[in-house]
UniProtKB/Swiss-Prot annotation:
Its job: Component of the mitochondrial ribosome (mitoribosome), a dedicated translation machinery responsible for the synthesis of mitochondrial genome-encoded proteins, including at least some of the essential transmembrane subunits of the mitochondrial respiratory chain. The mitoribosomes are attached to the mitochondrial inner membrane and translation products are cotranslationally integrated into the membrane.
Highest taxon of source: Eukaryota
SUPFAM superfamilies linked: S13-like H2TH domain
Pfam families per the UniProt record, alphabetical: Ribosomal_S13
GO molecular function: RNA binding; structural constituent of ribosome
InterPro entries: Rbsml_uS13_C (IPR027437), Ribosomal_uS13 (IPR001892), Ribosomal_uS13-like_H2TH (IPR010979), Ribosomal_uS13_CS (IPR018269)
Subcellular location: Mitochondrion
Protein name, entry field: Small ribosomal subunit protein uS13m
Alphabetical UniProt keywords: Mitochondrion, Ribonucleoprotein, Ribosomal protein
Family statement: Belongs to the universal ribosomal protein uS13 family.
Length: 119
């Protein structure tokens, strides 16, 4: 098991997929980190030397990921709601925010936009 930022990863997991499992890191950011440390995209977690693992941990600790990224998104939504914008009201009602039709297919938006609705 390889330990990075409080998460244990299996030795057989790809490094790129392990990095993408952190909230706020996508394919491009993980590919950029791999290129920075000269890690092959198909490399597994178990093949990394401890020096690279500590460098990855240091790199990830400087980035806005996990709870910090979630808090940033929620703060942006709260800011929209407090300003009283159209998007903020749509978030508050749990409706689609980006102009989608609401006649039939809003079930997904109602699932994803679950926020405190009153207050």
């Amino acid at each position: 098991m390889v330990f990075i930022l409080g998460v244990n990863f299996n030795e057989h997991k790809l490094v790129q997929k392990a990095l993408e499992s952190f909230y706020g890191l996508g394919q491009q950011a993980s590919a950029r980190i791999l290129a920075k440390y000269s890690i092959h995209p198909r490399a597994k977690m178990g093949t990394l030397p401890p020096k690279i693992v500590t460098a990855l941990t240091a790199e990830l600790s400087t980035m806005t990921i996990e709870n910090d990224a979630r808090r940033l998104v929620l703060d942006n939504i709260k800011r929209l709601r407090d300003m009283g914008t159209y998007r903020g009201r749509r978030h508050a009602m749990g409706l689609p925010v980006r102009g989608q039709q609401t006649r039939n297919q809003i079930a997904n938006a109602r699932k994803l936009n679950k926020i405190e609705r009153h207050g």
